[in-house]
């Protein structure tokens, strides 16, 4: 089994996006002549204002794998509408055997979330949130489950439009 090194690196490049490396795995391909070693990197990228992207990269060298992952994360960004530094409402996300429960929190709570979820909320610009991982804690699946849950979130205006009501009627 490949050894996993979990790293959280924070960089900010000239395009204003925040980058975090979540995990780097050493992977092995077994061929007739022996083993071929390589590295797989998992990263997240965000703009601090609700946009988030996840990327994976593989290469024979760590820096190349990380760069590939960052480039993929930049290409696959989604937009999540935030409300005062937290989420609109409680959401759940799932990917594989990983499930996450993400709830908004009041001011002063901070980010209460484990590992990969914390990195996502950091780069996304969420300042107050409570998140719980249920099931598998595999970093790849946790990141995908978190992004799945965030993509399911909708604003009061979207819900009002679906129901054919005003926002005031929805919020009560």
From Swiss-Prot:
GO terms for molecular function: rRNA binding; structural constituent of ribosome. Belongs to the universal ribosomal protein uS5 family. Part of the 30S ribosomal subunit. Contacts proteins S4 and S8. The N-terminal domain interacts with the head of the 30S subunit; the C-terminal domain interacts with the body and contacts protein S4. The interaction surface between S4 and S5 is involved in control of translational fidelity. It comes from Polynucleobacter asymbioticus (strain DSM 18221 / CIP 109841 / QLW-P1DMWA-1) (Polynucleobacter necessarius subsp. asymbioticus). It holds the Pfam family Ribosomal_S5. One of its GO terms (biological process) is translation. Keywords: Ribonucleoprotein, Ribosomal protein, RNA-binding, rRNA-binding. SUPFAM superfamilies: dsRNA-binding domain-like, Ribosomal protein S5 domain 2-like. Signal peptide: none annotated. Residues 17-80 form the S5 DRBM domain. Transmembrane segments: none annotated. The lineage of its organism: Bacteria, Pseudomonadati, Pseudomonadota, Betaproteobacteria, Burkholderiales. With S4 and S12 plays an important role in translational accuracy. One of its GO terms (cellular component) is small ribosomal subunit. Gene3D superfamilies: 3.30.160.20, 3.30.230.10. This is Small ribosomal subunit protein uS5. NCBIfam families: rpsE_bact (TIGR01021).
């Amino acid at each position: 089994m490949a050894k996993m090194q979990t790293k959280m690196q924070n960089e900010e490049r000239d395009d204003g996006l925040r980058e975090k490396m979540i995990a780097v795995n050493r992977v092995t391909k077994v061929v007739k002549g022996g083993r071929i070693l390589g590295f797989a990197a998992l990263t997240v990228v965000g703009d601090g204002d609700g946009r988030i992207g996840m990327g994976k990269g593989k290469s024979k060298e760590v820096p190349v794998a990380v760069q590939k992952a960052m480039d993929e994360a930049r290409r696959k960004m989604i937009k999540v509408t935030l409300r005062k530094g937290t989420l609109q409402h409680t959401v759940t996300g799932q990917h594989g055997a990983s499930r996450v429960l993400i709830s908004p929190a009041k001011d002063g709570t901070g980010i209460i979330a484990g590992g990969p979820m914390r990195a996502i909320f950091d780069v996304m610009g969420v300042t107050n949130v409570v998140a719980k991982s249920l099931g598998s804690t595999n970093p790849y699946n946790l990141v995908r489950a978190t992004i799945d849950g965030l993509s399911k979130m909708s604003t009061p205006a979207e819900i009002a439009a679906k129901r054919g009501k005003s926002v005031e009627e929805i919020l009560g």
